[in-house]
């Protein structure tokens, strides 16, 4: 184990979205044993009710991200996902919203992997904002639906999509490091600028012009561009992690034999 430095393994973990804490042997085993997921049909989600953002994308042979469908929707009114829901936050009504959303996303995109931005449970103030609780409720219901369906698929021996929870701080800080941005990634304008740089640098490509049109004309329609940026950063960052994990995992296997 002396032939590989701890700092090098920590750097690999940073490039692959893995935790950097632990001893050398722990990091090495983490890199080698972490699963590699398919990147052909990936759905990145920035969860919200009036600002539900999604980015459906894939990765080509050059590890570049190709966006197929990208938008942000207000689920309380007429929307592009055809969710029909009255703004009512009682558990029964939220369950109806969750089922509609769950079924629509699976039927519309048939994703192999779903990435959901992890919601916060603490706001740093004495009282938790009501909207935070509502979105947390939606998040929990979507997870419950997923694992119920996953259990059924296992019993029927059917392949079912993976659902992964991603820390927004991890994906945003990763892209801030890659793009060498000096602005704080916690600021919405900074994340919008990050996506703009990824598009201008052709690290993000588009299958069609519709998604790019929505992005370029965001100021003319009723959605916030920062929410749209977040789902793209989640999807593109995670797929880049996967490509690098595949590369470094094979490289690190040699050190396990020493």
Curated annotation (Swiss-Prot):
Q: Report a single Gene Ontology molecular function.
A: four-way junction DNA binding
The record's SUPFAM superfamilies line, in alphabetical order, gives: Ribonuclease H-like, SAP domain
List the catalysed reactions: Endonucleolytic cleavage at a junction such as a reciprocal single-stranded crossover between two homologous DNA duplexes (Holliday junction)
One BP annotation, GO = mitochondrial DNA metabolic process
Report domain SAP positions: 1-35
Top-level lineage group: Eukaryota
Entry's Pfam families?
Ydc2-catalyt
Q: What is this protein called?
A: Cruciform cutting endonuclease 1, mitochondrial
Please spell out the taxonomic lineage of the organism that makes this protein.
Eukaryota, Fungi, Dikarya, Ascomycota, Taphrinomycotina
Write the gene name. Answer: cce1
């Amino acid at each position: 184990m002396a032939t590989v430095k701890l700092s090098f393994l920590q750097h690999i973990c940073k490039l692959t979205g893995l935790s950097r804490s632990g001893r050398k042997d722990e990091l090495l085993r983490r890199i080698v044993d972490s699963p590699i997921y398919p990147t052909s049909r990936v759905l990145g989600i920035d969860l919200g009710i009036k600002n539900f953002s999604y980015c459906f994308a894939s990765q080509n042979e050059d590890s570049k991200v190709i966006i197929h469908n990208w938008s942000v929707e207000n689920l309380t009114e007429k929307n592009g996902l055809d969710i029909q829901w009255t703004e009512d936050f009682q558990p029964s009504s939220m369950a109806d919203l969750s089922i509609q959303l769950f079924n629509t996303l699976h039927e519309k995109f048939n994703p192999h992997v779903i990435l959901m931005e992890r919601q916060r449970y603490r706001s740093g103030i004495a009282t938790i904002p009501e909207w935070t609780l509502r979105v947390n409720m939606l998040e929990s219901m979507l997870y419950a639906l997923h694992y119920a369906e996953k259990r059924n698929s296992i019993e029927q021996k059917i392949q079912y999509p993976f659902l992964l929870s991603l820390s927004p701080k991890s994906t945003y800080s990763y892209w801030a490091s890659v793009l060498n941005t000096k602005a704080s990634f916690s600021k919405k304008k900074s994340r919008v600028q990050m996506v703009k740089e990824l598009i201008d640098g052709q690290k993000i490509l588009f299958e069609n012009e519709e998604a790019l049109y929505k992005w370029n004309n965001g100021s003319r329609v009723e959605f916030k561009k920062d929410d749209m940026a977040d789902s793209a950063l989640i999807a593109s960052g995670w797929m880049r992690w996967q490509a690098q994990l595949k590369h470094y995992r094979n490289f690190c296997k040699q050190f396990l034999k020493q």
